Amino acid sequence: LHVMVLERGYVGAPSHFRLLIAGMRPHPAAEAYLRLRTLPAEQAQVDWSHFGHLQIGRARRPLMAFVMVLSHSRMVFLRFFLDARMDSFLRGHALAFIAFAGVPRVLLYDNLKSAVLERQGDAIRFNPTLLALAGHYRFEPRPVAPARGNEKGRVERAIRYIRDSFFAGRTFTDLDDLNAQAQAWCLGTAADRRWPQDGALSVRQAFEAEREKLLVLPQREFALGERVAVTVDKTPYIRFDLNDYSVPHTHVRRTLAVLADEHTVRILDGSAELARHPRCWD
């Protein structure tokens, strides 16, 4: 357009021309948002958030926060992990359900790989491990629409609140100390804040009413633990998550299985346990 008007005798500056054109362009219609209202125990929102790194010995581990928020009462569950692997994701759910003493009926997720492997429009292929967890606890996993982060605004705001009210300026000795402080904060400061739907009530009071309507926890625990196949070379060690763990020398040049949780690494040959080691994070 600028070239065209120059050919017709326009002598103004390009910046002035851009201002003139900007005033003539049609503006996109403002998008309206509905305020989210949920029934007690109807929904929770889940997300990961990165909180920097921890130096453990020679290793620099990411500090990841698993956050779950009950959409009705705004009760927050917070747990820090040294990774965002699937086992940590599942463990965060299990610990949150224990903390809430029940399970919400719907869990809302962003389209993270731990929840959604593939999505084409409304056709969703869930992570089968998450579906197994959902079947065990009887909740419905539900991803938000792509580029619709506002649909899980409760957990996004909770993460900002965690950064400002809990994490900023906090000191801790190790991950266990940080998680102990996080638990105390969730049950104290975060629970005592004003409930947004009724300023006369606290989040704690709203949660006490909501807790009665949560789904009952199953009698047996969900089987947690990361299981991976590993190959033993000519030396009697396997490599798992940046560290070497010993196995009996009789099992060199074999394919074995590792079953690991936060604290322990077990090495299996079929169902037989060959070795058990404390998990090393450095």
Show where each model-derived region lies.
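Active-site-proximal acidic segments at structured loop/helix or strand boundaries
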Residues: 159-262
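Two-metal-ion acidic nuclease core segments, chiefly of the RNase H-like superfamily
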Residues: 123-141
